[in-house]
Amino acid sequence: MLRRGETGLAGAPTHVQADRMFEIDPAFSATSQALGDLALSHARLQADARFPWIVLIPRRVGARELEDLAAGERDVLMDEVLRAGAAARAVAEALGRPAAKLNIGQLGNITPQLHVHVIARRPDDAAWPAPVWGFGVAEAYAPAAQAAAEAAARRALGL
């Protein structure tokens, strides 16, 4: 685990630190679909058809806050957030609901594992202008929409 003030690992990110394997919190597995791994983060599509929503989970054991990442890793994460923004916009386009605004948040109040939400929003979406967290009940994607959303997100992320 990286501790505050440490420089982190040199070179490519790894799934293993301090003899422990990186694992995704079960809450993410229950509420989202895996898209694939970027240089630092595991990318997922949130399972809520109301909002084109990408979640990035940096593959760092024990990371809970941005400050738990080395400076270079934070730079990589910011690049991945921008790519996730393009992916959320691509999902919105694929679903016929172009995005007007991106919401980006790193909360962790409920699921403490470090993660970043990137959500494409529109003035006519179910929660606008309020935050999407805790708004109503998630709506499952129809199978064709799920496939289109995943394909659009993966293309935009380069996966």
Residue ranges, per PLM feature:
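N-terminal amphipathic/basic-hydrophobic helices that include classical n-h-c signal peptides
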Residues: M1-D19
